[in-house]
Amino acid sequence: MIDLYTWPTPNGRKVSIALEEMGLAYRCHAVDLQAQDQFHPDFLAISPNNKIPAIVDQKTGQSLMESGAILIYLADTCGQFWGDDRYTTLQWLMWQMGGLGPMLGQVHYFKKYNAGKSVYAEERFFNEALRLYKILDQRLAETEYLSGSYSIADMAVWPWVSRFEWQGVNLKDFLNVQRWYEAIAARPAVQKGYDQPMYMNDIPKV
């Protein structure tokens, strides 16, 4: 049994989607970010960086923070979802962790939550988001999924793309991304994992 500590954010949804896809037994514990549950000492003992998601694998005693590390652990645990090549999968997972996620997070911060406070920041991060979407679209013109077959790299990237409306991005401008996004959105495990630890909103449609 795996205990998952999470909230309905892109990073949180990565792991709940992975657990559903892998069919691993888990219990979901809501960490309410608005109530600042992430600063509770019990949670900090698992995730010292006070960020969700985090897991505790009751079978092995392993606790982990950082969504990318958790995805790698889960893929190794179940022996699935490494795509056609482990290192290609890791490459795109790191691209998400180091580039796509942080940059789209800045778009959310400036464009959605603080619109008008810094035109420079809004434009800078929006343009970077478009650059990253172009890279993603080019990759998905070459292959069905990021690593050939469906993998943890797709599970990491997809929840961030699912907030395209927050980013002001039109997926119809990126037809390969749109095809990939809609295919993943139709997966039953993704639909179930998206609503953990609770329903927040429908999966956005293009």
Model-assigned labels for residue ranges:
Residues 35-36, 180, 200-201:
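Short secondary-structure capping/turn micro-motifs that flank functional sites
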Residues 74, 96-188:
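GST-like fold's C-terminal all-alpha helical module
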Residues 190-206:
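Terminal-tail/helix-coil boundary detector
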